[in-house]
Amino acid sequence: TYDLPVAIHTRAAWKDMCRTVETETKAAREKGLRLRGVFHAFAEDADTYRQLKECGDFLFGIGGVVPFKKSRLADTVREMELDDLVLETDCPYLTPVPYRGQRNESGYIPYICNKIAALKGTTPEEVAAATTRNARRMFGFDAARQTTNDHSSPTESI
């Protein structure tokens, strides 16, 4: 096996996806394997989050929907643990406020980070640190490896 995480993109089929993930997680465990991955563009309710959280080692990709004024995702994010989140875009779609209606790009990640921080009552730096740790863990990056480039904080551009 390659022991790689999966990226799951589901629309309007979360109940079916929950059943599938539960079945596949059980099958993987029976073989001594670990099913893990990311639920891309997650924008569901807290009940769906809790159900999927029990299914295995999955992260929840939070993107440009969270800043939308009528997004139910804001209520869900308040209940989610930072250790379960990664920041993402759905480029070129789901552009966060204040750029909604324009082409999405990774440069808008700070808006998502800031909104999550506000919802969680923490700092953008803490959200950025937690979601970076989560991504490094999920994708097997060596946490001790440091780049030689001086990268700015994801919140500095705002």
Residue ranges and their predicted role:
Residues 6-8, 37-40, 60-62, 85-89:
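Hydrophobic faces of well-ordered beta-strands that scaffold small-molecule active sites
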Residues 97-99, 113-114:
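Crotonase-superfamily enoyl-CoA hydratase/isomerase domain that binds
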Residues 43, 64-68, 91-93:
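Short, acidic/turn-prone active-site loops that include or flank metal/cofactor-
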Residues 26, 57-58, 82-85, 144:
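Generic structural signal for secondary-structure transition and capping sites
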Residues 107-158:
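Mid-to-C-terminal alpha-helical segments outside catalytic/metal-binding sites
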